[in-house]
Amino acid sequence: MSEPEIKVGKTSSALFDRAPMAPSMPGGRASSSHGLSVTDDIDARIWERIKDHPCFSEXAHHYFARMHXXVAPACNIQCNYCNRKYDCTNESCPXVASVKLTPDQALRKVLAVASKVPELSVIXVAGPGDACYDWRKTVATFEGVAREIPDMKLCISTNGLALPDHVDELADMNIDHVTITINMVDPEIGAKIYPWIIHGHRRYTGIAAAGILHERQMLGLELLTKRGILTKINSVMIPGVNDTHLVEVNRWIRDRGAFMHNVVPLISKPSHGTYYGLTGQRCPEPFELKALQDCLDGNIKLMRHCQQCRADAIGLLGDDREREFALDQISTKVEFDTSKREAYRKLVQHERGDQLAAKLDANKAVKSLGSSGTLAVAVATKGGGRINEHFGQARELQVYAVSLKGINLVGHXXVEQYCLGGIGEKATLDHTIVALDGIDILLSSKIGDCPKKRLAETGVRASDA
């Protein structure tokens, strides 16, 4: 019997539409994918736990999708960068959802998505409030998913205030991945970020509130580490508030066993209705974010591919499909078909084998050149270790360091799409040029003469692969 046809995001069942990055680039150098198998800094046991999780593995986010079930609207803290919205379809940032779901509605939606999105590997509760504070709804949702799709990964995102009360239950439910947002370890700084919290049926403000939050976050992280649960720490970079302080946050979480640190830029616009947005708090520039990430690199694994997802996000990172699954368009009885999901997993396994072979060949080719120095190479890719994205359509670029040590993925550069029908192209390209500071070579499937010339003027050699 033939295997079912698989649709992969915007690509076909071939997964990706070009051959793996070949061991040749301008100047005779090579490019390859990194992290497609057991990497140098992750042992085999950890790799097995993260290889299908798009947020905990950079390699996985090209193959696997996540779904956030927006079942937890209640929250126990107020953040100056957050305005929880439950009926918003336009904004793309955390704490925003188009509709609140009951656990039963969420399960129906999960089954519908899993039937049509074979890449789906993770169901998370990330709000729009707090998963641990709105605990009964979170648990009811996870129990339903575990019953219907036993091999689906479950994870939560939390501010950490109520987390210590539920670590044992998380472990009992086989939840292996938890994200905590930690923006400070100094209550004086925390008071500038959090105006109030609710804890023990009491409302606290100012430094007292931030002090309680800090203690609970550290306790929760320590308890998760003791239970062997992988923890990712999200930190919002707020210029002039906690930007330099995040170095200290990084040290604290590393010492308490966090697996990964994800530093994301503040999203702050007046239209969002947040305190920071209304008071004019600026967002960090791309070069400021990169400088901070580079400063932290080496202390702990860094996530550099975060898309700062909505509380109801569905699909591959950067390719949200939530609007395809409006609740009123989903049948009251959904038949979940596992065949497409199983076939897709086989394709990914084969693809990863090809990528590992290509990586080994490319590293050999680079080392045989014998030249010294390191090249920084940015690649426009839809994933799979292939140069298959038009420069003007790219939302992010993978950055590789190419040297005698081999080819290693060192980060991501978030960029805006350049091809917008002639609207704002110059401003967008200016932003991209800033993001490409320090890059020697840009590889894409196609690039126009105008952006190629502008990049050349800044010292970036652009090539159509």
Swiss-Prot record:
Keyword S-adenosyl-L-methionine attached: yes
Top EC group: lyase
Binding site for S-adenosyl-L-methionine: 81, 129, 181, 233
Binding-site residues for [4Fe-4S] cluster 1, renumbered to this chain: 75, 79, 82
Positions of the Radical SAM core domain: 61-312
Entry note: cofactor: Binds 3 [4Fe-4S] clusters per monomer. One cluster is coordinated with 3 cysteines and an exchangeable S-adenosyl-L-methionine. The two others probably act as substrate.
Example GO biological process: nitrogen fixation
Name of the protein described by the UniProt record: FeMo cofactor biosynthesis protein FixZ
